[in-house]
Amino acid sequence: MKGKYFIPCLLLPTMMLASGGGGETDIVERTINFVIFIAIFYYLAADKIKAIFVARQESIAAELEKVQEKLKESKKAKEQAQKRFEESKRMAEDVILTAKKEVVLLTQKVEDSTKGDIENLIRQYNDSMEFEKRKAERAIIDEILAELFESDATKLDKSAYSEILLKKVA
């Protein structure tokens, strides 16, 4: 803001005095006056300008330090996230492996149980068939014996009964 007013103040005397005649130029005196003006200006404003630049430098350094601190924090957060990701990945692999093992075990258990059930059903079927076979044999034997005992016409001995039974059963 001060710069906006400072530059026109420097140029204003030059414009006002530029309308002079074509006389002799006093360039040496003007140069000496300009150097004196710059020296006075430097004497009065140098500390303030230095303070402005130092303050600006310090604010930039502080801002840079904050940015570096945030960068370090974000790197730490990234590393932690990467570690958590790797751990989660490892845990997921463990869960998958465990699930596969459980599937194999459950499949084996179901197969064993099913085989046992099938063997029991086959055994029950065979026992039932054997029982029905014996039942049918007894019924046939009872029928034959009933016929033989009812018919008094034929008097047979034990060997004849045995032969008749064997023929009927076979």
Swiss-Prot record:
Entry's Gene Ontology molecular function annotations: proton-transporting ATP synthase activity, rotational mechanism
Subcellular location: Cell inner membrane
GO cellular component, as recorded: plasma membrane; proton-transporting ATP synthase complex
CDD domains, per the entry: ATP-synt_Fo_b
Record's keyword terms, sorted: ATP synthesis, Cell inner membrane, Cell membrane, CF(0), Hydrogen ion transport, Ion transport, Membrane, Transmembrane, Transmembrane helix, Transport
Membrane topology reported for the UniProt record: Single-pass membrane protein
Transmembrane segments: 5-25
Primary localization: membrane
Cell inner membrane among keywords: yes
Oligomeric and partner information: F-type ATPases have 2 components, F(1) - the catalytic core - and F(0) - the membrane proton channel. F(1) has five subunits: alpha(3), beta(3), gamma(1), delta(1), epsilon(1). F(0) has three main subunits: a(1), b(2) and c(10-14). The alpha and beta chains form an alternating ring which encloses part of the gamma chain. F(1) is attached to F(0) by a central stalk formed by the gamma and epsilon chains, while a peripheral stalk is formed by the delta and b chains.
Function field: F(1)F(0) ATP synthase produces ATP from ADP in the presence of a proton or sodium gradient. F-type ATPases consist of two structural domains, F(1) containing the extramembraneous catalytic core and F(0) containing the membrane proton channel, linked together by a central stalk and a peripheral stalk. During catalysis, ATP synthesis in the catalytic domain of F(1) is coupled via a rotary mechanism of the central stalk subunits to proton translocation.
Family designation: Belongs to the ATPase B chain family.
Official protein name in the record: ATP synthase subunit b
Species assigned in the record: Wolinella succinogenes (strain ATCC 29543 / DSM 1740 / CCUG 13145 / JCM 31913 / LMG 7466 / NCTC 11488 / FDC 602W)
Phylogenetic lineage: Bacteria, Pseudomonadati, Campylobacterota, Epsilonproteobacteria, Campylobacterales
Recorded name of the encoding gene: atpF
